[in-house]
Every structure is written in C-alpha cells, then in structure tokens.
C-alpha cells in the first residue's frame, strides 16, 4: 500500500482553555481528492494551519514529508475587487522565474489565454476561480489545499471547477485537500470525505454515505441532510 502524503495520529491542539481539535486521526492519500466538512467552529481551520506548519500539535503526531511542496488558497484570497492588474501580470508576480514555461502547461487545461489581459476586477466568479487555481499550482506543488473554493460559484461553475480539479490532479499528479460545506457536491466529486466536529465524527468514501448508514447518521446529526448519490466517475 502506498504511503499517505499526510498522516494525523491522535492529534490534539489546545489554545488556552480551548481544545478545537481532540484526538484526530486521518490520512490523505496521494493523488486523491480528500474533502473535510464540518460546522462552523469544528476545527477545520486549525487542521489546515497544522498541515501548513503554522501551528504545532499539543499532543499527537503529524507525519508529513518536509520536502512536500504545498499550494494553499485561503477562503479569503486577499485580492481587492478593484485590483488594477491584469491576470498575466498577477501570475507573473507570483512566479517570475518559471512563469512562462509552467503557465503554458497550466494554460493547456485551465485556459487562461482569453482572460490573460483582463483586469482582476473585471472577472466573473468562475473566471476568478480559474486564476486562483493557477496561483495554487504555478509552482507545481505536490498538494494543494483549497479552503471553501465553491462559496461564490453557481452550480454550473462549481461543476466546471471540479472538472478542472480532476484535470489538474491527473495531469500534474497533484493531491487535493479541500474544505467545503456543500455536501451534495462533495459526495459527487471526492475520493474521501472526512467529517469533523472537534473530533473525527466519520470518514470514508462517498458511496458509504447511504441512507441510515453510520456515516449518513453522523452527518445528519451535524445538520448535513444526506441521501445517496452516485460517486463521480
């Protein structure tokens, strides 16, 4: 069996008297799409900060290759709506040394050519998300972490986004770790789903989320109403 790209072993993190995550264990498999879901305050942000090395666990162990290259797209990406800079210039600022060679490969499946000269402020939600994806992979990471990437997208744009994610992981052999509240989309498009509420409530593959299953009941108890959907192909 191939070694997981990240492994949490009985990890707890304490901030003062608060314990946002307690005894959390899970693995992220290479080249999979793993999605972490949970209510507000469940500890999802703490998990990401631990993955990025911004926090250290109070207890437990996180096994991660120190050479692992990670691309991260936070929930609030930090671009102002009136940013007077073109898409090409923005990406060039991110990775000037290898932009030209890498962006050609990225452009072959993200298709930024027709928007490269547009200002960031003029982009639609779907177009902006393409730029965000390009930002996360322009330096060819082993893993990308996406925090709530679907929030401002309509249903059509969400599906286009997942199609791009699948192309990215297949063409560049990238592992994807995502945080989302959209259970329906998660079920259709993830290889593994982890439900967090301070601890791991349930985890598994989407086809295990069947009516009255332990997985489904755990999700329902947190306000995620489930019914069976076919796993993505």
Swiss-Prot record:
Its main location: membrane. One of its GO terms (biological process) is response to zinc ion. It comes from the Bacteria. Pfam families: ABC_tran. SUPFAM superfamilies: P-loop containing nucleoside triphosphate hydrolases. Keywords: ATP-binding, Cell inner membrane, Cell membrane, Ion transport, Membrane, Nucleotide-binding, Translocase, Transport, Zinc, Zinc transport. It is a peripheral membrane protein. ATP binds at residues 38-45. InterPro entries: AAA+_ATPase, ABC_transporter-like_ATP-bd, ABC_transporter-like_CS, Metal_Ion_Import_ABC, P-loop_NTPase. Residues 6-222 form the ABC transporter domain. It is an enzyme of class 7 (translocase). GO terms for molecular function: ABC-type zinc transporter activity; ATP binding; ATP hydrolysis activity. GO terms for cellular component: plasma membrane. Its EC number is 7.2.2.20. The keyword Disulfide bond does not apply. It catalyses: Zn(2+)(out) + ATP(in) + H2O(in) = Zn(2+)(in) + ADP(in) + phosphate(in) + H(+)(in). It is found in: Cell inner membrane. Belongs to the ABC transporter superfamily. Zinc importer (TC 3.A.1.15.5) family. PANTHER family: METAL TRANSPORT SYSTEM ATP-BINDING PROTEIN TM_0124-RELATED, ZINC IMPORT ATP-BINDING PROTEIN ZNUC. Part of the ABC transporter complex ZnuABC involved in zinc import. Responsible for energy coupling to the transport system. The complex is composed of two ATP-binding proteins (ZnuC), two transmembrane proteins (ZnuB) and a solute-binding protein (ZnuA). This is Zinc import ATP-binding protein ZnuC. It comes from Rickettsia felis (strain ATCC VR-1525 / URRWXCal2) (Rickettsia azadi).
């Amino acid at each position: 069996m191939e070694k997981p790209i990240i492994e949490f072993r009985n990890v707890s993190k304490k901030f003062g008297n608060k314990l946002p995550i307690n005894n959390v264990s899970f693995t992220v498999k290479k080249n999979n799409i793993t999605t972490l879901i949970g209510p507000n305050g469940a500890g999802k942000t703490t998990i990401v900060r631990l993955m990025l090395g911004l926090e250290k666990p109070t207890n437990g162990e996180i096994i991660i290759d120190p050479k692992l290259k990670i691309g991260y797209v936070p929930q609030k990406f930090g671009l102002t709506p009136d940013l007077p800079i073109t898409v090409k210039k923005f990406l060039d600022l991110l990775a000037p040394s290898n932009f030209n060679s890498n962006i050609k490969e990225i452009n072959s499946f993200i298709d930024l050519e027709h928007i490269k000269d547009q200002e960031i402020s003029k982009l639609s939600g779907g177009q902006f998300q393409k730029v965000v994806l390009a930002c996360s992979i322009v330096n060819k990471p082993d893993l990308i972490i996406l925090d709530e990437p679907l929030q401002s997208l309509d249903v059509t744009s969400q599906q286009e986004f997942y199609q791009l994610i699948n192309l990215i992981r297949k063409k560049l052999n990238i592992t994807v770790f995502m945080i989302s509240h959209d259970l329906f989309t998660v079920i259709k498009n993830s290889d593994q789903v982890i439900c967090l509420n301070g601890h791991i409530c349930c985890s598994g593959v989407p086809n295990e989320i069947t009516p009255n299953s332990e997985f489904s009941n755990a999700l329902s108890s947190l306000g995620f109403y489930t019914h069976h959907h076919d796993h993505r192909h």
